Amino acid sequence: MAAIDMFNSNTDPFQEELMKALQPYTTNTDSSSPTYSNTVFGFNQTTSLGLNQLTPYQIHQIQNQLNQRRNIISPNLAPKPVPMKNMTAQKLYRGVRQRHWGKWVAEIRLPKNRTRLWLGTFDTAEEAAMAYDLAAYKLRGEFARLNFPQFRHEDGYYGGGSCFNPLHSSVDAKLQEICQSLRKTEDIDLPCSETELFPPKTEYQESEYGFLRSDENSFSDESHVESSSPESGITTFLDFSDSGFDEIGSFGLEKFPSVEIDWDAISKLSES
């Protein structure tokens, strides 16, 4: 019983729990302690009831009971869980995406061939967004959709007068070359000139014979066609000088003589 006295002399509460757990196994033990047959996992084992004669299964069972009691008695001794910080969603910008190592990249789609132009790698998303805005304004002008439209009307900010230029010099030179090529293609693709889009107006003057067209270009075009046609020689033999075109111009009609029968003249001829 020396082992039992040692546990009783200790004031640790867990040791008292251990003694309570060992009570079924520490019955009256003496020099002639009886033996009994114990079946563990289907095997017959003959063991003594002394404290120093516990089987491994009994020791494991006692440890489980002690762990359960410790969790019930002292729950505050366990470390408190630390809540994770709520990760706020990063604001997304047009033409900007993040690499898995944390850097931000910017790229823009060209208007003609729909390919992407690499604008560079940046430390912050805002800097990458500014690089995209600068490239978009150079390519599309006032029609560009920007991440920061409030800077559009600031003097020199997107026009190149600002000292802040997030684009690399090589990227900026490539962008300028693309802009020049786009301007050339736009000049070539013009469908027609301004004179063809807006033809000269024709004016009409009112007269007693109706409305007369006073388009100078029409007269010049008609005279040019007559002179250039192979049948223009025929018109030279026609003489309209004696006709009645003097009063009403080239658009008048000559008066024909009356076709009524003059009976007075016929009667005079018959009398004579």
From Swiss-Prot:
One of its GO terms (biological process) is ethylene-activated signaling pathway. Signal peptide: none annotated. Keywords: Activator, DNA-binding, Ethylene signaling pathway, Nucleus, Transcription, Transcription regulation. The keyword Secreted does not apply. GO terms for molecular function: DNA-binding transcription factor activity; transcription cis-regulatory region binding. One of its GO terms (cellular component) is nucleus. It comes from the Eukaryota. It holds the Pfam family AP2. It is found in: Nucleus. Residues 92-149 bind DNA. Probably acts as a transcriptional activator. Binds to the GCC-box pathogenesis-related promoter element. May be involved in the regulation of gene expression by stress factors and by components of stress signal transduction pathways. Belongs to the AP2/ERF transcription factor family. ERF subfamily. PANTHER family: ETHYLENE-RESPONSIVE TRANSCRIPTION FACTOR ERF060, ETHYLENE-RESPONSIVE TRANSCRIPTION FACTOR ERF061. This is Ethylene-responsive transcription factor ERF060. It comes from Arabidopsis thaliana (Mouse-ear cress). The gene is ERF060.
